[in-house]
Structure formats: structure tokens, C-alpha cells
Amino acid sequence: ILERGIGKVYVGSMDPNPKVAGKGVQILRDHGVEVQTGLLEEECLSLNEIFFRYITTKMPYVAMKYAMTLDGKIASFSGDSKWVTGEKAREHTHFLRKKYRGILVGIGTVLADDPMLNCRIENGVDPVRIVCDSHLQIPLECQLVKTAKDIETIVCYAEGNEEKQKALME
């Protein structure tokens, strides 16, 4: 900015990182650059909410997505849980998968739905797939295992047979 001779800069939100907070703005002002802060501040805070939460609390940003029927069930009367929601909700699911670094499911979801847990939005990056499976019940034939070489997948378990552990590592 200084090298290019830019005379006016707009800053939507200040960086809360204590290592840099406000220092860049001050350097620009010290060199005669007019700096206006707070332009579209709410939008900028929303855009950077994941980073801001981590940098100020050192805690991860966690979002939960849950689908249920009008009567509070997570599956239809027939037991089908794949299509409890409509098309818009499924699109939003893929937006969330694009936005967040990881997706966590329990072994029950894997056994019931055999999900891919990938992002189907153009140019979307697949989230790391994390499965909580305390007894290592994950089927070697499921979509998550079949595609684990292409999409990072973590299976968290407390116990399980050594043969299955080896097979999953391959």
C-alpha cells in the first residue's frame, strides 16, 4: 500500500490477534494514509467469525447440523433417515461442508446411511471426515473406507480387533 502510494484505505474490521491488532492501521496512518475503519463491520465480522473465535478464545468454532421430522424424529416412519430434509436443506448441508474443516458423525450414522460426507459444491474442498466408533464397527465396504485414500478420514475408537485396524490403515 505504501509502495504503491495508495492514499486511502477502508478497513471493515480490526484484526483481534494481539500480535498485530491495530499495528498495520497505525503504520499506514503514520505514513499519511487516510484509514477509515468499521465499513461493513458486521459483515466482515461474520465473514471472519471462525478465525476471530479461534484467535480470541483459542477454542474451535463448532457448528451443529441436525435434521428431524415435524414430530421430532430423525428418521421417517419407514426408518429411512437419508431424506428427512428437503432439497434446500441438503444444499445448505453442502455449504456447511465447504465452510468447515471437518465433519463428525457417530458410527450409528455410518451404519444406517453409509454416507460419503463430502462436499458437492463446485470448487468445494471436502472436509476431514471424523467417525466416533468406540468398538471399531465401521464396515470395510462402506463409502467412507472406500474413499479414505481420496478424502482424509479419521476413525476414533477405543477397542477393536487388530486385523480390522490393519485393514483400515491400508
Predicted regions and their residues:
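Short, flexible helix/strand-to-coil boundary loops that buttress conserved ligand/catalytic motifs
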Residues: 13, 48, 78
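Short capping loops/turns at secondary-structure boundaries
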Residues: 17, 21, 37-40, 55-59, ...
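Proteins enriched for Cys/Gly/acidic motifs involved in redox and nucleic-acid/cofactor modification
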Residues: 39-67
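Active-site ligand-binding patch in enzyme domains
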Residues: 1, 53, 63-70, 74-170
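Short low-complexity, flexible loop/linker segments enriched in glycine and/or proline
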Residues: 24-27, 50-54, 119-120
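Hydrophobic, well-ordered secondary-structure segments
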Residues: 25, 41-48, 90-97
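Short acidic loop-to-helix transition motifs that present clustered carboxylates
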Residues: 17-20, 42-46, 110-112, 137-139
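Zn2+-dependent cytidine deaminase-like catalytic core
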Residues: 1-44, 128, 154
